[in-house]
């Protein structure tokens, strides 16, 4: 017997699905929208209680959408199925926030770079280095993670960075990495890596346009700071 509380067990005027159909999705709270996705609660919590406590316990939607499947399944009432639903919703949200109609994403300012990578990188618990490869019109043609771990100039080798750009016929590159602390202030190592890659790029004819450091909903551009 299924003892889990379902949306249909709620009074009809309290069911988020009914409210969405009648009034539109925009009137629903975050908890109600999440309840529509998850559908069932537990034997001790109806789905609205579960959705509300889930958002509160993880610290809000941003934090909820950056949990791993292991972290989610440790939360009372969240099994593998619900964790997978949340992860899929999280990924769709990230992709939508960085989506532009058509297949082209042109970089004109550091903010364009931030808008492209922020959702993916701002809450990472480890440092990750991404390379954006651009064509002669500054349109992003390829993005790849090239390193995960603590960045320093002895580990981040220019060969690994520029090899991808050469293979993809890139005209220029932008590198991005995150600071798990949430503070995007460049470290001495960040500056050293930037200068080293800038120098190597000039030698092979693939310019390093910028190095963007991602923090918690903020970023620093090495180009804007005058480092390169």
Curated annotation (Swiss-Prot):
Keywords assigned by UniProt, alphabetized: Hydrolase, Metal-binding, Metalloprotease, Protease, Zinc
InterPro entries in alphabetical order: MPN, RadC_JAB, RuvA_2-like, UPF0758, UPF0758_CS, UPF0758_N
Listed SUPFAM superfamilies: JAB1/MPN domain, RuvA domain 2-like
GO molecular function, one term: metal ion binding
GO BP term, pick one: proteolysis
Keyword Metal-binding listed: yes
A Pfam family hit: RadC
Entry-linked CDD domains: MPN_DUF2466 (cd08071)
Sequence positions that bind Zn(2+): 177, 179, 190
Locus of motif JAMM motif: 177-190
Gene3D superfamilies, alphabetized: 5' to 3' exonuclease, C-terminal subdomain, Cytidine Deaminase, domain 2
Domain MPN: 106-228
Family assignment from sequence similarity: Belongs to the UPF0758 family.
Protein name: UPF0758 protein CLK_2387
Source organism of this protein record: Clostridium botulinum (strain Loch Maree / Type A3)
